[in-house]
């Protein structure tokens, strides 16, 4: 009889104390299956071609405007590998969000069709990054490192200091670094060294 009551008593004690049978840090939330960032290790040739066409059209438009920008917001020296693996999705999410925001605000009817597919792809990537970073924050909340904080602050600050044309130039110049290097690195997780 005591053997039958022991599991019930143990369950009652664990429930009453709100103890977890497995430590939280090792358990993934149920929604974790919704994080599918690994699918972006490489984009399809069709998607890359659409981005190449959009980049070319935007660069041509900027040249016609004779845009002069003193610096690039997103430095070529910036490398996500400098961050801890778990911080990389947050940094990439900020880059993708900025690219989306800038490209969505381009008011040129000639570019509407050209930007359609790239904007759709960037939106999909951004939504996956949001899901992954939210799940990660829930599973293991940690404050961001100083390096990540500085980078995120710099991106935020540039949005208020830079002209729309220079922001456009910067995110467009950084596009293939974002798609081919940064996205692949985040999608590869701890295999990106």
From Swiss-Prot:
Alphabetical list of Pfam families matching this protein: IL28A
UniProt entry keywords in alphabetical sequence: Antiviral defense, Cytokine, Disulfide bond, Secreted, Signal
GO cellular component: extracellular space
Signal peptide residues on this chain, from the entry's feature table: 1-19
GO biological process: cell surface receptor signaling pathway via JAK-STAT; defense response to virus; innate immune response; negative regulation of viral genome replication; positive regulation of immune response
Molecular function in Gene Ontology: cytokine activity; signaling receptor binding
Coarse class of the protein's main subcellular location: secreted
Compartments where located: Secreted
Disulfide topology: 35-132, 69-166, 185-192
Presence of the UniProt keyword Disulfide bond in the record: yes
Family: Belongs to the lambda interferon family.
Function of the molecule: Cytokine with antiviral, antitumour and immunomodulatory activities. Plays a critical role in the antiviral host defense, predominantly in the epithelial tissues. Acts as a ligand for the heterodimeric class II cytokine receptor composed of IL10RB and IFNLR1, and receptor engagement leads to the activation of the JAK/STAT signaling pathway resulting in the expression of IFN-stimulated genes (ISG), which mediate the antiviral state.
Protein name, as recorded: Interferon lambda-3
Organism: Mus musculus
Top-level taxonomy: Eukaryota, Metazoa, Chordata, Craniata, Vertebrata
